[in-house]
Amino acid sequence: MMGAMMSPPILSESKIQQHSLRHLRAFLAVIDTGSITRAAELCFVSQPAVTQALSKIEKTAGLMLFSRTPQRIFANSAGEVLARRVERAFGYLDPALSELSPRLRVTATTSQLKALIAVRETENFTLAARQLGLSQPAVYRAVSQLEEVAARPLFERTPYGLVATRPAQALAQAARLALLELEQADADLAELTAAEIGRIVIGATPLAKSYLLPKAIASFRKFRPNLPIQIQEGPYGDLLTALRRGDVDFLLGALRDPPPIGDVEQKVLFHDTIVLVSGCSHPLAGRREIAIEDLTSFPWVVAQKGTPIRRYFDQIFSDAEGGAPKNIVETGSLILMRELLDTSEHLGCTSRLQAEAEIARGLMQALPFDMSKTSRPIGVTVRKDWLPTAAQRTFLELLPTPPERDL
């Protein structure tokens, strides 16, 4: 369930993804026009082709998607659920396709887009083929077909691999988010029959792993006992990238001020403060008062540069003679911090909520140094236009907040 950040996989093949983009466009056209005849005209296909496309989509969905009257055909509740996801998918995809060539909106296929995504991520046709489980010539041909319609190369050859052009990067990103919408359409449709389909992928910082997730997962299992949950770990920057490209559904941890980029939104759950800690046998353990000068002569275990905790740590020593300590170990691992504090005279700077359990068990000790002005928001970061599935929404509603007390 829990794993470190790795090369992102191509999105799993969902039931709705099995249909061609042309079929899905015909599905939307029927809903928009209320007429198979008119939809066929708009999509430049025959009426039997549209009828066949609708039949196949309904069979895959396992649900009737349309109601019919003598005057028109219209989406029922299940059809509206699917249409919402398909519309969102093309909302991502069509602008990026049109930027390369308007013809791509007609000719591009799911297989071609998956090949583009894989080559962009691996920067190599052979590695992309391995990732997709295809032959190298098949991947090369799929990308070449996109390039032929676009009338331009999508990749530049460099000594280090294939680098996607800017329009190709935009299309690969849009395609990834579009395919994610089609994958989540399966989950939305399953909700209508009380089935469990899909998964939740969470980007987690150290505080989220130690405080937020255990309680939320335990509560979630009472409602969704079988739905897979995957935890992705890594530096904040990597997790943010994974969030923006759709590899994780949401990111839990310390929020940034200002928000890191315009296409994400942050929601505050509560505030946490920083605490300075030592091992229980440390020379400073048990002291009633500690001055800044007492802290500068010991080695430290601290978070990496660029993190909120590290910023507060540096501020502590901003007025100290000689500045911040130089003999530091940079890590986000509370386990490594705990062991270093236990076996040496290292001091630590970490989240109070994250350290509470260790302090309560007597594995480390909070130092009496005023950190009341280090309050920082903890919460959820999501893509700005994200539409959660019912399961994802339930999980977010179950995220714990700490009891009201002075941190």
Model regions: which residues?
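Central regulatory/effector-binding core of bacterial HTH transcription factors
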Residues: 122, 127-144, 148, 198-257
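Flexible hinge/capping segments at coil-to-helix
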Residues: 194, 263-300
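A late-sequence structural motif
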Residues: 365-407
